[in-house]
UniProtKB/Swiss-Prot annotation:
This is Small ribosomal subunit protein uS17. It is found in: Cytoplasm. Belongs to the universal ribosomal protein uS17 family. One of its GO terms (biological process) is translation. One of its GO terms (molecular function) is rRNA binding. The gene is rps11. GO terms for cellular component: cytosolic small ribosomal subunit. Component of the small ribosomal subunit. Pfam families: Ribosomal_S17 (PF00366), Ribosomal_S17_N (PF16205). Component of the small ribosomal subunit. The ribosome is a large ribonucleoprotein complex responsible for the synthesis of proteins in the cell. Keywords: Cytoplasm, Ribonucleoprotein, Ribosomal protein, RNA-binding, rRNA-binding. It comes from Xenopus laevis (African clawed frog). PANTHER family: 40S RIBOSOMAL PROTEIN S11 FAMILY MEMBER, 40S RIBOSOMAL PROTEIN S11-RELATED.
Length: 158
């Protein structure tokens, strides 16, 4: 519990009561606090780290106060330089009627990445779900991570 207290405010899950009095039980050692977690539905499994972990994240869809509703999208991770937020790239085709052809286009999206998803790398494919606005630019939450396959055939810079 001491390793998660790195912020100025005391980090705790708001739905868990931590001041239980254990006078007559004769407790031995340090007991683990109960943990609040839930299923977001829509066929997405709750990660094991969300159930067993000790992180505190109020914007996590599995342990926080965020509901997933609206669109379900997918994209490729391009940047991981923010704290608990990643940038994903969504590629799509746009039809040009004059030339009867398609052109490639893309959009970048800022997405909240919960600490329950470890080992996320640039190039992984993520499935995101829409939620309420979490910040100025973040409106989606990561629900599932699919590891990038071995990219031997694609061109790599280095």
């Amino acid at each position: 519990m001491a390793d998660i207290q790195t912020e100025r405010a005391y980090q705790k899950q708001p739905t868990i009561f931590q001041n239980k009095k254990r006078v007559l039980e004769g407790e031995t050692g340090k007991e683990k606090l109960p943990r609040y977690y839930r299923s977001v539905g829509l066929g997405f499994k709750t990660p094991r780290e969300a159930i067993d972990g000790t992180y505190i994240d109020k914007k996590c869809p599995f342990t926080g106060n965020v509901s997933i509703r609206g669109r379900i999208l997918s994209g490729v991770v391009t940047k991981m330089k923010m704290q608990r937020t990643i940038v994903i790239r969504r590629d799509y085709l746009h039809y040009i009627r004059k030339y009867n052809r398609f052109e490639k286009r893309h959009k970048n999206m800022s997405v909240h990445l919960s600490p329950c998803f470890r080992d996320v790398q640039v190039g992984d494919t993520v499935t995101v779900g829409e939620c309420r606005p979490l910040s100025k630019t973040v409106r989606f939450n990561v629900l599932k991570v699919t590891k990038a396959a071995g990219t031997k055939k694609q061109f790599q810079k280095f």
